[in-house]
Design a protein with these regions (language model features):
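Gly/Ala-rich beta-loop-alpha elbow adjacent to hydrolase catalytic centers
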Residues: 113-117, 121
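Active-site loop/oxyanion-hole signature of alpha/beta-hydrolase fold enzymes
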Residues: 21, 67-112, 275
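Conserved alpha/beta-hydrolase catalytic His-Asp/Glu region
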Residues: 144-150, 164-222
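Flexible "cap/lid" loop of the alpha/beta hydrolase fold
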Residues: 122-126, 130-162
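Alpha/beta-hydrolase fold catalytic core
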Residues: 1-38, 60-63, 103, 162, ...
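Catalytic active-site module of serine/aspartate enzymes centered on a nucleophile-bearing elbow/loop
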Residues: 252-288
């Protein structure tokens, strides 16, 4: 993970309503009237800052941009119950936000969800979120499969329950073994320690138990006439690349492979991610 999260940008830190919930967000507006609003949803242990390197380029491309912290992430408060952080309830919250942004069809919304945020974004669409296009970035058809990332969740969950979030943070820093720039290390530490414990636990449960809902999503997208893009880094180590390709085929979705990136293209190679996203999004908007 590179220093992209601390990329300087011209976005404004705001709070937005999502149903009965208030979410922290970064908002960037183009000079001319926006062609659409791009809503960017981070993954497990992530935050709106994961999209920092995308904000100004997307704005320059004529889009309004809204990157959010999900409930319980970094600067967004959240409920105390772990089950409120599963993809379904978070998806309903996100759907409420998208519905407000769409203004009864007067504003087009491009929804992008990364990793766990992709599971939440699909739940939002299944809850009726009125989107013009859906992008699943480094996400999968259901629960996170066996591998290093799944094993890390299995290791840290009991520690989080018994020892607390600060001990888990120390454990993660030891496991990482990468010397980040001080400003980035400070951000990553602050956002993890600011996370709701119930949120970390609930999302971990979601990552291990979410069912395959691809057939259901494909039907919903087809009925609504909404296009879909499945994008992933060429070295993604969360959901295997063949799994994501198969998901795209089942969804009737386009595929974009981001070179020089693994599980987090927005931070690992944001320029290549933008090169993949923008032509497809422009085509969707032209056709809608």
């Amino acid at each position: 993970m590179g220093p992209a999260q601390i990329t300087p940008h011209g976005a404004t830190r705001i709070e937005v309503r999502a149903g009965s919930t208030t979410l922290a967000a970064l908002r960037a507006e183009p000079v001319d009237p926006a062609s659409a609003v791009a809503v960017l949803v981070p993954g497990y242990t992530g935050s709106k800052e994961d999209f920092a390197a995308l904000l100004d380029p997307l704005r320059s491309a004529g889009l309004s941009v809204l990157a959010v912290d999900l409930p319980g992430q970094y600067e967004s408060g959240g409920p105390d119950r772990e089950d409120e952080y599963l993809p379904d309830p978070l998806g309903r919250t996100l759907a409420a936000l998208v519905t407000d942004l769409a203004c009864g069809g007067r504003q087009r919304v491009l929804l992008l969800g990364h990793s766990y945020g992709g599971l939440v974004a699909r739940s939002a669409v299944l809850s009726g979120a009125p989107v013009t296009g859906l992008t699943l970035l480094g996400s999968g058809p259901g629960a996170l499969p066996s591998g290093r990332r799944r094993a890390l969740i299995d290791i840290t969950e009991p520690v989080l329950r018994t020892e607390g979030i600060e001990v888990v943070q120390q454990l993660l820093e030891t496991q990482d073994g990468i010397a980040e720039p001080p400003a980035l290390a400070a951000l990553l530490r602050a956002r993890f320690l600011s996370s709701a414990t119930a949120g970390l636990l609930g999302m971990a449960i979601g990552l291990r138990t979410e069912p395959d809902r691809v057939t259901e999503l494909a039907a919903a997208l087809r009925t609504a006439g909404v296009p879909c893009l499945v994008a992933f880094g060429e070295f993604d180590d969360a959901w295997p690349v063949p799994t994501q390709r198969a998901m795209a085929l089942r969804l009737g979705a386009e595929i974009a492979v981001v070179p020089g990136a693994a599980h987090s293209p927005a931070t690992e190679n944001p320029d290549a991610l933008l090169d993949a996203l923008l032509p497809i999004w422009r085509r969707w908007l032209t056709a809608s």
